[in-house]
Regions:
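Active-site Asp-x-Gly
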Residues: 205-208, 213-273
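Phosphate/pyrophosphate-binding loops and the adjoining catalytic core of nucleotide-dependent enzymes
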Residues: 1-4, 74, 318-321
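An alpha-helical support segment within catalytic cores of ATP-dependent transferases
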Residues: 8-28, 123-124, 129, 137-210, ...
């Protein structure tokens, strides 16, 4: 077992990644790099004498069960023509390793978070339109049930509305118990969730990208999307939640407005209100873990810094109740 506090973790995982790739692809490894990116998993980039370029992503011990669904979901998305990593193996049937893992071909590109500051207006527009198109296509994948997915095709709960309600009240309890937010903000959240959803979802049982943030979106030099990565925390439910989850992290940034304007479908007032509702959902789901370190052992930022979009979402929801 590898502990996240072990100073030699990068060395141990580089060694494990090399072994996995050599056995999986029957080749010799030339170089292994421990990537200092991502907060929920450990990533190694492995290059071989046969010009293979592979990412081995290790799940921390308390997230080991993710391997039971993420590789299959990635393959399902890939086969549907979506720009996601193509898995070539994982720890369920592949070579042994200290932690559960998925291995996939490296995707060229840099994160949108890194490239956006240097993009001119044209490339920002290209990125906004292409990202909107990619995310809109995600809702074509159906998920049986609701809430956290447990396989590539099914989620844990039966009712989306019940899942959302339970998650929100659980998050509120954590906020109160651990004093994660200012009392006035906590009271406002409680009033909003007690009033109930601003509308009812017209569509459910669709894939929701629960890991959406600009650090999980790869772009080319011209601004076009080259890959959507990290699908470990996806949900089944109202596809508008993907927009709400994005708004929680990036809703206060100018590019988010450009992205929203590029959305292929005109959104009604009720749908805009639901997006704000799902922004609150992401914040409250994170609240259940905000007092704990990340699965990788790194400390978390304060909740309101992680999800600044909660403030404008609350304003909107408060105004309609």
């Amino acid at each position: 077992m590898i502990e996240t506090t072990d100073k030699s973790i990068s060395h141990a995982l580089k060694k494990a990644a090399a072994s996995v790739v050599e056995e999986m692809l029957s080749t010799h490894v030339l170089a292994v790099e421990f990537l200092l990116q991502g907060m929920m998993t450990f990533k190694c980039r492995v290059r071989t004498e046969n010009n293979d370029d592979v990412i081995v992503r290790f799940y921390p011990a308390r997230r080991s069960s993710v391997v039971d669904h993420e590789p299959d979901l990635l393959m399902r998305c890939y086969r549907a023509g979506m720009t996601v990593p193509k898995p070539i193996g994982d720890s369920r049937s592949g070579p042994s390793a200290p932690l559960s893992y998925v291995a996939y071909r490296y995707i060229n590109g840099e994160t949108l978070a890194d490239r956006l500051p240097s993009f001119d207006a044209l490339r920002r527009q290209v990125a906004a339109e292409d990202l909107a198109s990619h995310l809109y296509r995600l809702q074509s994948l159906t998920i049986e049930g609701a809430g956290e997915i447990v396989t590539s095709r099914a989620a844990r709960n039966s009712s989306w509305d019940t899942f959302v309600e339970d998650a929100m009240f659980a998050g509120l309890v954590s906020i109160k118990n651990y004093k994660l937010l200012e009392p006035s903000l906590t009271s406002e959240i409680e009033r909003v969730i007690c009033a109930g959803p601003p509308a009812h979802a017209s569509v459910t049982q669709r894939l929701i990208w629960g890991d959406i943030n600009f650090g999980n979106i790869l772009v080319n030099e011209d601004g076009r999307i080259s890959g959507l990565i990290d699908f470990e925390s996806c949900l089944g439910g109202d596809p508008l939640a993907t927009l709400g989850y994005a708004a929680a992290i990036h809703g206060t940034e100018p590019f988010f407005s450009e992205f929203r304007q590029a959305w292929p479908q005109t959104l009604s007032v009720e749908e805009e209100n639901l997006i704000a509702w799902y922004t609150l959902l992401r914040a409250l789901r994170l609240a259940c873990y905000a007092h704990l370190p990340l699965p990788t052992g790194r400390p978390r930022d304060p909740l309101v810094h992680i999800v600044p979009g909660i403030i404008p979402a609350l304003r909107r929801l408060t105004a309609i109740h």
